[in-house]
Amino acid sequence: MSENFAAFAYLVSGVLFIMALRGLSHPTTSRQGNLYGMIGMGIAILTTLLLARPSFGSLVLIVLGIALGGGAGAFIARRIAMTSMPQLVAGFHSLVGLAAVLVAAAALYAPHAFGIGEPGQIHGQALVEMSLGVAIGAITFTGSIIAFLKLDGRMSGKPIMLPMRHAVNAALLIGVVVLIGILVGTESHFIFWLIVVLSLLLGVLLIIPIGGADMPVVVSMLNSYSGWAAAGIGFTLGNLALIITGALVGSSGAILSYIMCKGMNRSFISVILGGFGGEQAAGQADDIDRTVKQGSAEDAAYLMANASKVIIVPGYGMAVAQAQHALRELADKLKANDVEVKYAIHPVAGRMPGHMNVLLAEANVPYDEVFELEDINSEFAQADVAYVIGANDVTNPAARDDPSSPIYGMPILDVDKAKTCLFVKRSLGSGYAGIDNTLFYKDGTMMLLGDAKKMTDDIVKAMDH
């Protein structure tokens, strides 16, 4: 295959990747988007094989690698629960980072195989690209592993605050930059692996002080890192498809991180610095009447059965309890009684971007019933019931009304404007921000304390009587 034709094929795969992103932007076109991505990746792999013209032995290894990787991917995809998607995404990001490190190491030890020079005489530009790719890849690898452990509950989701962490991180970052300069000048293998070690450590230290509920930003941020790592290695290899794909993933992840931060009214830097929710925050919650109106499943069933409009607000509590199917059953029961049902999604609800959308899609909730914050917030005032299931800080009126609150200014779902707010939660404990939710103590709120799935199931049963 000629290089010109290969460049054209890579360009076609890049266009397909762009179409895939566009398709994945809406649930109704997500399957089509996935198909575009699969075709684009197939073209990129086939083009690479035809361009490289590997020997029979190398081809066997390549096919074996594709079979093992594809088989493992298919196995995981079939067995993974939708509630574990955040962990899966973080795990995949770690593999992208690891791949960038391994490819960079291979290029360092066998530069002639990659067309970037000979041992001891690697092109300076290739060394810079390789160094950046391996540094970002190593940070992505360990950062994603920490994110996986936090999301999977194998590590505390609370911020882990080390003394002088900012100074240590800054020193490590400066050290990596200096070592990259030394590597470009000396091509030392020892310096290369020292960059890897420092970057691996930096990845851990950057993520451990970030609280579990900031994970939507972290996941999209690591997604961006993995893209830039791939793009860096793409430049080293002179692979157009890898450069295009890496740039697409890197830029889309960065944009998504910005959107997530905007949804929390926080700067990207404040999230990366971490520590949010590490201590009990103060606010007006100490001065308000703490009387709580607690209800039962039967009370909730009566209110919903006599409502004309119900807006359901899912949050992380729904994901933990795996209550999405029970929620769909409740919605079906309400619609059978001529009750209008809609779902309201906050952009940072859950532990990854689109977490609630994924869970509702698994339960076959119709797409046209699911609305984003800006599209449905004005409708709460006309709703008879807002059924909040484990969405704490994203419904806290203090973010709207209390200038002294740490979350003041964060866009929230105005569930308190509904005639009645039914709030399902295990306890009256604070959310990740460490502050009381003033919604609990409002006259129009009825607390339904207990497991989200069991409570929803009990409401459905009560509606049958």
Where are the regions a protein language model picked out?
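Membrane-interfacial segments at transmembrane helix termini in multi-pass membrane proteins
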Residues: 248-307
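Cytoplasmic-side transmembrane-helix entry/capping segments in multi-pass membrane proteins
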Residues: 31-40, 62-64, 84-96, 159-170, ...
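Mobile "lid/hinge" segments at catalytic clefts and subdomain interfaces of large enzymes
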Residues: 211, 225-257, 261-269
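C-terminal ends of transmembrane helices
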Residues: 16-29, 70-89, 144-159, 202-215, ...
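Structured cytosolic domains appended to multi-pass membrane proteins
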Residues: 286-465
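Transmembrane helix-loop junctions at the membrane interface of multipass transporters and ion channels
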Residues: 53, 106-120, 184-190, 217, ...
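Structural signature of hydrophobic alpha-helical transmembrane segments
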Residues: 1-14, 51-70, 126-141, 187-198
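Transmembrane alpha-helix boundary signature
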Residues: 48-63, 75-84, 101-119
